[in-house]
Amino acid sequence: MKKEELQQNMKDRMQQFEDGGLRLLKKGQKGIVHAIFSRFGLVLLLMLLQVGVLWSVFRWFGELLPHYFGGSVAMSAFMVVYILNSEMDNSAKITWMVTIAILPVVGVPLFFYVKSNIGHNALKKRVTRLTEEARGLQPQPLVAAQELAEADLGAASLARYLHGKGGGFSVYRNTEVTYFPSGEAKFEELLRQLEKAEKYIFLEYFIIDEGLMWGRILEVLARKAAEGVDVRVMYDGTCEFTTLPRDYPSRLEKLGIQCRVFSPVQPFVSTHYNYRDHRKILVIDGKVGFTGGVNLADEYINHIEKYGRWKDAAVMLEGEAVRPLTILFLEMWSILREPEFEKFLSVPPHSVPAEGFAAPYGDCPLDGERVGEMVYIDLLNRAKRYIHIMTPYLILDGELETALKFAAERGVDVHLILPHVPDKKFAYALAKTHYKSLLDSGVKISEWLPGFVHAKVFVVDDSEAVVGTINLDYRSLYHHFENAVWMKDTTCIPAIEKDFQKTLEFCRDVEPTRESIWEGKVLLHLAGILLKVIAPLL
């Protein structure tokens, strides 16, 4: 499309927000009523019908068993032995054993359906091939590896894991890392950097929603596309259920912006939909990259209020370590097309003199390697003085809970900040079920009173930190595509710890008593107890 046509499309197809930015949707194209009578309503209805049919089949099958009770007991016993000998997390084993023991005719087929991975085998093969191809594009810079080993053998061992079994991610020097303690701070710098784009802009986000934030960004993207910049946008398919219409990619493409939707939700029951793209990546010309917890919607910059004040965090990378973010984006972009690695990675990485080391990495739920969790556990095991954590959720498996408790029992100051105002009541209830055990081991827990904490931050001993998208829950650690940046001795680490301490000023400290943990909320307490049985399935 010619430059003049793109500019005309900008004028014809967009409406200005009162406070700037651009809009592709008319006001009123959201809300429950719109959702019910949209594709969302149709997909939900068809899925419910399929679930109803499956339930009827299971009940019919149960009625056909001549000796139902004896058969169900034998079936349950066999499955318990099978699950006990599987490689699942212990919490997941308990969940499945309870489900099968109570509802064997439903639980057994459900277990095999979920574990057979029907619906995403093709995706797994494609992602595996792309990941292997990308490994060769990230050779470990020898100087960086040697200098890291000389500085800290423990940190060097983590770098070896990331470059080996962790997915082929290298550790880089010559990268300036800037920390943003809020979505507002990231947004301001992001707009400034977008204006500098000359070759390409890549965006991959879990949530995009029309409003001030996305409108301001979209205005720049459309203008840059008209100038000849290669602009690509990718978002998760759940946006079609919650924020954007199905035809939104075509609306963007009329502005010269390429757009793809990861795993659009179709009206078929499938385990494929369990794997969501929770990453948040923005890359500009291979020189500047952003990541962290901030999605592209107004609540993330406190332009609107959903759950009180919104607390988030992000980082900007300038230099060599932007390369892995470019690769992660191109991997996801290429799932349904031929990869374009060489087109964007043929030139040497952009270098910016800076202190410390940075290693952006991704986590894929289809390769059996829980990279995000392994990095967190390694930091907990190597911490000497303190490890300070901000996370929106706390739904732990046995390994991570043990690592948190063991670090505290070694005398490390383990301190977690969680939200006092939750976005999901069930997640809030589940988090509180872990409080007593952690507190009794010496872990400190504080809840941020002004609202919702969405930041995913680890900072350790004034020397290491992780900022990214990876929550402390089963969905992030087991089922989502995620990403983060591990840092060692970068100049921004003091700013991360300073932000933790400043956030702590507006928190309430939780004591290891029922009154302090549950605050007299009996129903919430009961919900937490019941939900914990099925936590790995949530």
Model-predicted regions and their roles:
Residues 393-415, 419, 424:
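Helical hairpin unit composed of two closely spaced alpha helices linked by a short loop
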Residues 1-374, 378, 382, 422, ...:
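N-terminal localization/anchoring segments of enzymes in phospholipid and broader phosphate metabolism
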Residues 381, 402-405, 432-436:
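Internal, well-ordered alpha-helical scaffold/interface segments
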